[in-house]
């Protein structure tokens, strides 16, 4: 059986929605899969030319198949990827989701989106990126060892402009600068900001979304030491008439700006002139989540 898997990229957090809020993006990981006598991966995409068989796709596929009590047969995989690696667009999450989709297909296992999100969250430790890649659109979720709850909201009609530096940033390094704990007072304030962000996203009150992204207390104040231009970019987006605001995308270093629909190209041009060391790329939210297509005989 031959089939293809397509998984969208994602951005997470949107400021204070730390490890909870995710948005699917129109950049994709694409796999062409066929059962074979042994595992093999072929990829010519930048950074993945020498990918071996011991990778996140096979690890997640093995994990899922074991959870289902199935035997995972080897496959030949031809991979194409246009999600930037280690930049904050959920490249690892997309690989995890692709692995779960692969396992479900080759093992003949039906799995709902909720079940896939549960498995992916167990592997990843948080639901934001993986759930966005599975459902598409916007997701707000919570995860523990006992349960995973995901609220799915349709993709918003806005433009997105990503400010992309040349350097990468490992998630492990970005998490290392976070505090071990917040005081009760700090946690209450940070939580209230996140609550308003979630409500504003659901109501599509984009002015309020931008304001709340800037008010994050969970991670951006600590991570700006790794991305020194973050405050300047956020201030620039907040002041621009076509932008609602900006936030670190996931762990960074990409900074994602939320922009009025149809204004992305013009804003991206201005943003690049202001921050010429980075690339400004116009994007859109991805409406559809991960999908599997069976090849026609």
Swiss-Prot record:
<dbReference type="InterPro" id="IPR020568">
    <property type="entry name" value="Ribosomal_Su5_D2-typ_SF"/>
</dbReference>
<dbReference type="GO" id="GO:0004413">
    <property type="term" value="F:homoserine kinase activity"/>
</dbReference>
<dbReference type="Pfam" id="PF00288">
    <property type="entry name" value="GHMP_kinases_N"/>
</dbReference>
<dbReference type="GO" id="GO:0009088">
    <property type="term" value="P:threonine biosynthetic process"/>
</dbReference>
<keyword id="KW-0791">Threonine biosynthesis</keyword>
<keyword id="KW-0808">Transferase</keyword>
<feature type="binding site">
    <location>
        <begin position="84"/>
        <end position="94"/>
    </location>
    <ligand>
        <name>ATP</name>
    </ligand>
</feature>
<keyword id="KW-0028">Amino-acid biosynthesis</keyword>
<dbReference type="InterPro" id="IPR036554">
    <property type="entry name" value="GHMP_kinase_C_sf"/>
</dbReference>
<dbReference type="InterPro" id="IPR013750">
    <property type="entry name" value="GHMP_kinase_C_dom"/>
</dbReference>
<keyword id="KW-0067">ATP-binding</keyword>
<keyword id="KW-0963">Cytoplasm</keyword>
<dbReference type="InterPro" id="IPR014721">
    <property type="entry name" value="Ribsml_uS5_D2-typ_fold_subgr"/>
</dbReference>
<keyword id="KW-0547">Nucleotide-binding</keyword>
<comment type="pathway">
    <text>Amino-acid biosynthesis; L-threonine biosynthesis; L-threonine from L-aspartate: step 4/5.</text>
</comment>
<comment type="function">
    <text>Catalyzes the ATP-dependent phosphorylation of L-homoserine to L-homoserine phosphate.</text>
</comment>
<dbReference type="GO" id="GO:0005524">
    <property type="term" value="F:ATP binding"/>
</dbReference>
<keyword id="KW-0418">Kinase</keyword>
<dbReference type="GO" id="GO:0005737">
    <property type="term" value="C:cytoplasm"/>
</dbReference>
<dbReference type="InterPro" id="IPR000870">
    <property type="entry name" value="Homoserine_kinase"/>
</dbReference>
<protein>
    <recommendedName>
        <fullName>Homoserine kinase</fullName>
        <ecNumber>2.7.1.39</ecNumber>
    </recommendedName>
</protein>
<dbReference type="InterPro" id="IPR006204">
    <property type="entry name" value="GHMP_kinase_N_dom"/>
</dbReference>
<comment type="similarity">
    <text>Belongs to the GHMP kinase family. Homoserine kinase subfamily.</text>
</comment>
<dbReference type="Pfam" id="PF08544">
    <property type="entry name" value="GHMP_kinases_C"/>
</dbReference>
């Amino acid at each position: 059986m031959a089939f293809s898997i397509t998984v969208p990229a994602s951005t997470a957090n949107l400021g204070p929605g730390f490890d909870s809020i995710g948005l699917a993006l129109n950049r994709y990981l694409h796999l062409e899969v066929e059962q074979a006598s042994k595992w093999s991966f072929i990829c010519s995409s930048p950074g993945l030319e020498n990918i071996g068989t011991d990778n996140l796709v096979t690890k997640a596929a093995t994990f899922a198949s074991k959870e289902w009590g199935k035997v995972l047969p080897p496959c030949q995989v031809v991979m194409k990827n246009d999600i930037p690696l280690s930049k904050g667009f959920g490249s690892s999450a997309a690989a995890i989701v692709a692995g779960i989709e692969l396992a479900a297909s080759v093992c003949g296992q039906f799995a709902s989106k909720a079940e896939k999100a549960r498995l992916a969250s167990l592997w990843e430790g948080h639901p934001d990126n993986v759930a966005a890649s599975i459902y598409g659109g916007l997701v707000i979720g919570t995860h523990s060892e006992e349960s995973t709850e995901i609220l799915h909201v349709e993709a918003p009609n806005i433009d997105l402009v990503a400010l992309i530096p040349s350097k990468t940033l490992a998630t492990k390094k970005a998490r290392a600068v976070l505090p071990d704990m917040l005081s009760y007072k700090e946690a209450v304030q940070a939580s209230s900001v996140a609550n308003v962000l979630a409500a504003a996203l659901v109501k599509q009150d984009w002015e309020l979304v931008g304001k709340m992204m800037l008010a994050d207390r969970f991670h951006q104040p600590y991570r700006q030491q790794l991305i020194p231009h973050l405050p300047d970019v956020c201030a620039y987006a907040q002041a621009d008439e076509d932008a609602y605001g900006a936030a670190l995308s996931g762990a960074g270093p990409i900074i994602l700006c939320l922009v009025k629909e149809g204004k992305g190209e013009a804003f991206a041009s201005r943003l690049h002139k202001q921050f010429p060391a980075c690339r400004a790329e116009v994007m859109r939210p991805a409406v559809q989540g991960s999908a599997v297509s069976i090849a026609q005989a």
